[in-house]
């Protein structure tokens, strides 16, 4: 029999959204274990899980965009290989001066 969890998001003391989630027994048990591990409520654990997954998705999207930029311009973030070489030469000279 499915287990229902009511979720409500509170932002600045104002109820933003609420929903009911249907969990199978295994997922319900996992949620209870997570809550016992230090969350103040099942709602807090679920909100945290959503936020962590969103951050991971966002990182994946940024990585994909970076890979596309590198594919289009192997010298990225520089406009050209000449600009990249000039920047490296300046950096190397600066490091040599500061090491002396």
Swiss-Prot record:
Keywords: Toxin-antitoxin system. Residues 77-100 are annotated as: Disordered. Antitoxin component of a type II toxin-antitoxin (TA) system. In M.smegmatis neutralizes the toxic effect of mRNA interferase MazF4, its cognate toxin, on growth. Forms a complex with cognate toxin MazF4. This is Probable antitoxin MazE4. The lineage of its organism: Bacteria, Bacillati, Actinomycetota, Actinomycetes, Mycobacteriales.
